[in-house]
Amino acid sequence: GVSLANAAYQQALAYAKDRKQGPPLTDFNAASVPIIQHPDVRRNLMLMKAFAEGTRALTAKAAYHADVSMHAEPGPEKEKSQDALDLMVPIVKAYSTDKGFKVCELAIQVFGGYGYCSEYPVEQYMRDCKISSVYEGTNGIQAMDLVGRKMRQKGGALFMGYVQELA
């Protein structure tokens, strides 16, 4: 989800800067402008960027906890990182794959009809991204694991600690 979201965003951004279609809203008699100047395209691109960067940040945080849990000396820091990682895995997996798919969908929207054609990579990105929400336990199964098991670990203290960290 993370890599495809970022790739889809970069492709859509480049296309929106290059593709000219329609005049600006401020002057309907003007020549066609790059579609990045149209409000709906800009809104889609901003949403795509936010989701792409959000998935990257969340994944980086999980990677940090993975590194600490694997390489720190045994002790509280290592245990805390392992606990955080255990809790974050289903969250990162579901969020990244769901938002990655949404970014790919929005990229197709930015491309318009061309986005649905195989000549442009966003069509393939969307198909590739969808399978990531199914592999390694569907996102629904991951959610059940989070709610049914991981949020209850250590009497719920692990989850509440994570919530406090986010606040």
Language-model features and meaning:
Residues 1-167:
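Flavin-dependent oxidoreductase catalytic core characteristic
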